[in-house]
Design a protein with these regions (language model features):
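Core segments of small alpha/beta cavity-forming domains
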Residues: 73-147
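Mature extracytoplasmic/luminal segments of secretory-pathway proteins
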Residues: 23, 123-126, 168, 202
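A short, amphipathic edge element
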Residues: 142-160
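Juxtamembrane and targeting peptides
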Residues: 22, 26-94
Length: 222
């Protein structure tokens, strides 16, 4: 992507490097234990039996169990993106819907400093997918986090598979915007970043399996 200085981002850490790959190739600890006490009545227990109530039906989680729900970079009340019904179709339209969804899982990874969600849909042949996930995981391991770098995803369109050689049933072209972003260390110091970008484009090729779509190829494009 000419004029974006994307390759210069490779010198940065984590988000800077990860987003460079995307556009040029294209704390919490354990909860404190409950130490509260419960008072015990001195009177003898009643022999009457309390009426039993029906157990509440457990809420079904609409995304995988390892998808994070918290993060430094989340907006108030923000929820993970949901797999769209349109992506269930084995059609180009279904592939387009899935491509948009996958990019939103990448956005969620930047928001939470956790790539678990996107990794559910990234195939082993997608080198950029693996690189992005590794960069985000490295940031988390260093107790760093991201500020900004949120993606706005525009509607995907069909694009030819060739010259991609990875296994693919369909390919989609996704345009997206990125807000200004930086990486923040454990002390709150901002030590790397870049300005906002608009109109970046990425090619996503996908293959349909019984369990759904997987991304097999991902690269930035002009």
């Amino acid at each position: 992507m000419a004029g974006m200085g994307g390759r210069a981002w490779l010198a940065g850490l984590a988000l800077v490097g990860a987003l460079a790959l995307l556009t040029s190739g294209c704390t919490g600890g354990d909860a404190a234990p409950n130490r509260s006490t419960v008072s015990v009545a001195s009177s003898a227990p009643s022999t009457s039996t309390a009426p039993t109530s029906a157990r509440p039906t457990p809420t079904v989680r609409p995304y995988p169990a390892d998808v994070p729900l918290t993060g430094h970079n989340l907006k108030p009340g923000e929820k993970p993106p949901l797999y769209p019904a349109a992506a269930k179709a084995r059609t180009q339209a279904g592939a387009n819907a899935f491509a948009e969804f996958f990019m939103r899982t990448l956005d969620w990874a930047y928001a939470t400093t956790n790539p678990s969600y996107m990794k559910h849909y990234a195939g082993p042949s997608c080198g950029l997918c693996a690189g992005l996930a590794t960069g985000i995981s490295k940031t988390a391991a260093e107790k760093h986090w991201y500020l900004g770098g949120r993606l706005t995803i525009h509607p995907a369109t069909a694009t030819p598979i060739g010259p991609v050689t990875a296994p693919a049933d369909n390919c989609s072209l996704v345009m997206f915007d990125v807000t200004a972003f930086s990486t923040v260390d454990r002390t709150g110091k901002v030590f790397s970043g870049d300005g906002a970008h608009t109109g970046d484009r990425i090619k996503l090729c996908v293959k349909k399996f019984d369990t759904g779509w997987n991304v097999t190829y991902m690269a930035g494009t002009k």
